[in-house]
Regions:
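Short beta-alpha connecting loops at secondary-structure transitions
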Residues: 3, 80-91, 157-168
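Secondary-structure transition/capping motifs at alpha-helix termini
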Residues: 24-34, 58-64, 108, 187-191
């Protein structure tokens, strides 16, 4: 084998989801009331560089961004398990309402995920909340939810290959993100 970490899950899975969701939003029967931004950030592993740049040089007024949904590593581990990070640990409880919206949308899915909030704690030793791009949005007061299926032995390793992705799970997480995005996009109030 080689020594290249191809990143099928970290973060090919999130990129695939973002493309699929953007396409579904564009070609769906009804577009959301709010505009949507689909943003890929670079330099996450080097210190959240891309998201830091974006929130400090946004392409739209920063106060017009009502929520940030982050999908990173969403294609592995138990088929019914999804970790959500942000609603409990975000500053000033700014993401609690968005977290409640995610919970209600998940409950309405044909096969709801078993949600684990283990990482949604400031005291968690892995500090997951501070390790992905949603963090910079939260620092600007934007409600966030980070969707992940969790860490695995191939994280940042050559074994993070497409053959290990659970594509059914990836599709289900993508559908949930699409449905949450539509709910946020059609809500009359900001998810504060």
């Amino acid at each position: 084998g080689d020594s290249i970490a191809n990143g099928a899950d970290d973060d090919g899975s999130g990129s695939v989801a973002l493309l699929a969701i953007a396409r579904a939003m564009q070609h769906g029967p009804v577009r959301p009331r709010r505009s949507m931004l689909f943003v890929w950030h670079v330099g996450e592993e080097k210190g959240l560089l891309g998201s830091s740049w974006f929130v400090n040089h946004p392409t739209v007024p920063i106060d017009s961004i009502v929520a940030e949904l982050n999908a990173d590593m969403i294609g592995r581990n138990a088929p019914d398990l999804l970790y959500l990070v942000g609603p409990r640990v975000s500053p000033n409880n700014q993401s609690r309402r968005l977290g409640a919206l995610v919970d209600s949308v998940n409950a309405a899915e044909p096969m709801p995920f078993r949600v684990d909030r283990t990482f949604d704690a400031a005291s968690h030793p892995e500090h997951i909340y501070e390790r992905s791009d949603h963090f910079n949005y939260a620092r600007k007061g934007i409600p966030i939810v980070f969707f992940t299926t969790g860490l695995h032995a191939e994280y940042h390793q050559p074994g993070d290959e497409a053959s290990k992705i659970d594509f059914v799970k990836l599709a289900r997480v993508s559908q949930l993100l699409l449905d949450v995005g539509r709910a946020v996009g059609n809500a009359t109030a900001r998810p504060r």
